[in-house]
Regions:
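Phosphate/dinucleotide-binding and metal-coordinating scaffold of catalytic cores
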Residues: 1-354
Length: 354
């Protein structure tokens, strides 16, 4: 890559600022199955190299995460695409059922939004106007696994709502139920209006280039990024709060790609709205088993006492919001009991911080 000032940078693989664009997670696997043979790529995403990912981006890179277009084909597809027609509010449930079925079959290329939860992307009417959204969904079956994911999608909605109402930037969400299926509609923050785009870089991509920790906690990585000027100091403070809140509500899925940063003019980056925030300790196990307990929270010293106190209040607000709901399944009751005890025990520890 050659910058405007003439400086040249070489990458052995995909540059760090392209890592989030490559097909990944649920949508990425579906994409590989659907388009792998057509593009001469392996049908299994796990077998892809950076060269394979780049080939996919050059062909279908007109609708991926962030604001970049790679190559003339992606640029032409973006410029020639007709204005998107938003899904009407009154037709969402039925339309989302159809889109979920297509996503499950791998029929829609969609965005490269990562994550293992089944999802699709679309453009839809919302109470605030038309928005690009990511829609997570449960399987249309009556079973323990689907029921648990339905509960967790509602919990995610309530967690993000708790953050937003406290003045913390968090993705705006809506829950839509249709028969046995639940949809969680999440507004995208890398899209502006019908065709506008915003740069977004995950903490994982930043870490790969500037830190190299691989698995460290968010607070450790963001402090190093703040010290080197890659992100704003207040972004590191906000990341600390999100990580502490997630710890207190049992979010065991706070890997480095579940936190992102945005910017209109490059470095230093500010923090993106929170997303993927749910008590994932209760997620179904790979073997189909169900968990209803939470490991004791560790009140790490790399987060300030003040931040822990604020996170504790947010966790209690989240718990109160959950307890007011009557639509969680009965089998989620033991989880709610464990969550209550977990937050109460952590609050006792936090109170000792002074």
């Amino acid at each position: 890559m050659r910058q405007e000032n003439g400086a040249a940078h070489h990458s052995d693989g995909l540059p760090w600022w392209l890592l989030d664009m490559r097909p990944q997670g649920y949508l990425g696997r579906a994409y590989a199955v659907r388009y792998g043979a057509e593009l001469g790529l392996p049908g299994s995403l796990s077998d892809w190299t950076d060269t394979h990912a780049l080939r996919a981006l050059l062909v279908h890179g007109h609708d991926v995460v962030g604001n970049l277009l790679l190559g003339e084909m992606a640029r032409e597809r973006f410029l020639s695409a007709p204005p998107p027609t938003p899904v009407p509010m009154a037709e969402k449930a039925g339309h989302y059922v159809q889109l979920a079925a297509e996503a499950a079959r791998g029929d829609t290329p969609g965005s490269s939004a990562g994550g293992e939860q089944p999802k699709f992307t679309t453009f839809a009417e919302t109470p605030d106007g038309p928005r690009h959204v990511i829609v997570k969904f449960t399987e249309p079956v009556d079973g323990l696994v689907s029921e648990r994911w339905s509960d967790l999608l509602l919990a995610e909605h309530l967690a993000l709502e708790t953050l937003r109402e406290a003045g913390v930037a968090a993705a705006r969400t809506r829950v839509i139920d249709h028969g046995q299926q639940r949809f969680l509609e999440v507004e995208r923050f890398d899209r502006v209006g019908a065709a506008g785009r915003r740069a977004i870089i995950s903490l994982g991509a930043f870490d790969a280039e500037f830190v190299g920790s691989g698995r460290d906690r968010w607070p450790i990585v963001v402090r190093r990024l703040s010290a080197s000027g890659e992100i704003r100091s207040e972004a590191a403070d906000e990341a600390d709060l999100l990580w502490a809140f997630g710890t207190l509500i049992g979010n065991t899925d706070m890997h480095l790609y579940n936190l992102s940063f945005v910017s209109e003019h490059g470095r230093p980056y500010g923090i993106a709205p929170a997303y993927d925030m749910s008590p994932m300790c209760f997620a179904p196990r790979s073997g189909g088993g169900m968990a209803d307990t939470i490991q004791k929270a560790t009140i790490h010293s790399d987060v300030s006492n003040e931040t822990w106190r604020l996170a504790g209040q947010l966790a209690r607000d989240f718990l109160a919001r959950i307890q007011r709901q009557s639509v969680f399944s009965r089998r989620f009751d033991p989880c709610l009991h464990s969550l209550t005890q977990h937050i109460e025990a952590a609050s006792v520890q936090i109170a000792k911080l002074g």
